[in-house]
Amino acid sequence: SVGAGQVLHCPYDAQKAKIVVKEMLDLLTLDLVEKHLVTDQIVLTVGYDIENLADPEHRKKYRGEVKADRYGRLVPKHAHGTANLKKKTSSTSQIMEAVLELYDRIVDENLLIRRVYVTANRVVDEQTISEETEFTQMDLFTDYQAVAAEQKAEQEKREKERRLQEAMLSVKKKYGKNAVLKGTNLQEGATMQERNNQIGGHHA
């Protein structure tokens, strides 16, 4: 598996934490591309902050299960889920769409978030899937020309995205991790730019 986790420097609401998840997925998919790997399963774990139960205002909004953290403090039970993809890929857009849909489904938007983990499971070398051939059961009711045109358009879109991913990797290697930043990285709550300036979790 390939993955990453992040402990936020302060509690984030669900919308700000979603920005961090997007950043982590960007990095995860670039990591897959760099290693020539693909996945069809992403696991998302979101840990809530102790303030949710310590603060009376937040406490009365929560009706769910409570767990003790490793220090014995009570916190809402973490959100945990799996996004299964139709086929193995390293596409940022496909992985992002699946995981953000999962995020919206499992995360309690009333709770403050302190930890986020994303992991790509069932990872294999991309060469192994390029050698696989898909067989489709033929029937009389499918417009196979339309299906072929749709598949061709999807393939061209993926190839364009792949070239962009490889270009981003090349620029980051040559000029540093902050040489290419997306609009997401400049939003309030984004952490990638600051994390890129740190070595071993500390400012360089």
Give the residues covered by each predicted segment.
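Basic, low-complexity intrinsically disordered segments
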Residues: 1-204
